[in-house]
Amino acid sequence: VLEDFKSKVGQHIEILELEQFGNSLFIDGEIQVATTDEHLYSSTFVGAGLNLNKNNERAAIIGGGDGGVARECISKNFNFIDWYELDSEVVDVCNKHLGDIGKKATEKNSVKCVWGDAFQSIKSIKDDTYDHIFVDLNDDQFCIDLAAKNMDSMIRILKPKGVITAQVGSQDKKPKQVDNWLNVFNHHFGNAKLSRVYIPSFDCSWNFSSSINH
């Protein structure tokens, strides 16, 4: 156990060194990311969006405290990346123990970190700002409801033909949850494309849903 504490926003954060998967982040008892296979998650996540729209001018990341999605956006040459993260302590602890994942994404000129409630923060963003929005929230019903409640706000800041992509959990373990996410996307966009990848540290396939703003 490398870290074990409760953050100021009330999340139970642990960094454990796992024999098979290296340093790994747990939040509230659930694994979020492991050093050895994080690239599978982030590359599939960002790739799912870019498969529907190649434009890489401007991206928003909502959540994603380990920095993997931000790093992947940098590697895909996005010019501007706004990273909205509630819990700066997650980012700090990941920079400290899982440094290779974020590769100091917070220090890159193309990345602007906005701390606090993302859905409050995006209220000040102009219409039609982003080519891509990546929603990397926890995979539970609370976050599905939160995203659904704020979907109109996200659509407002998404360019025409822009793409929103979310990690939606595992059809292997929680199929109803994935269906609930897909229902939200289909309701708001009329389209949803599911991508999946097997992640060994999660011991299951993981799903990402993308929708185009027609």
Regions from the PLM with identified roles:
Residues 2, 12-14, 100, 109, ...:
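Short, well-ordered helical secondary-structure segments
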Residues 200-214:
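Core SAM-dependent methyltransferase catalytic element
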Residues 28-29:
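Short strand-turn-strand beta-turns centered on an Asx-Gly dipeptide
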Residues 21, 33-183, 188, 202-204:
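The AdoMet/dcAdoMet-binding core of the Class I SAM-like
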Residues 13, 32-33:
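Short, isolated positions in well-ordered beta-strands
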Residues 1-24:
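N-terminal auxiliary segments of SAM/dcSAM-dependent transferases
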Residues 189-200:
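Conserved S-adenosyl-L-methionine
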